[in-house]
């Protein structure tokens, strides 16, 4: 019998790849607040669809807004800190899938 986690990943691989591809295609150059915020909105949609959670938004004037997602409850917490702006200028980052990768 296949591990339930591995089974889930195998069953949903195409959906996850499509979400990842869509995220990469949301260009978010650091200096372009509007594009970074659009990428943030896409992330908010992903979190809402897959985890049923909405972020706390910390509006910024020059850079993209900061987002805080709280998932789960309890005394033991894990912090995942990341950014979603990119160092690439607009239209400089290409994506491709070859042989399913």
Please give the residue ranges for each predicted region:
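Acidic/His- and Gly-rich active-site-bordering loop/insert found
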Residues: 2-101
């Amino acid at each position: 019998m296949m591990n339930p986690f591995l089974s889930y990943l195998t069953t949903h691989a195409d959906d996850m790849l499509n979400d990842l591809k869509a995220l990469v295609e949301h260009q978010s150059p650091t200096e372009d607040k509007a594009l970074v915020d659009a990428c943030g909105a896409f992330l908010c949609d992903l979190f809402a669809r897959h985890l049923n959670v909405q972020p706390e938004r910390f509006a910024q004037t020059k850079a993209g807004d900061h987002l805080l997602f709280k998932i789960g409850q309890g005394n033991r917490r894990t912090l995942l800190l990341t950014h979603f702006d990119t160092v690439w200028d607009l239209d400089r980052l290409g994506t491709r899938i070859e042989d399913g990768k």
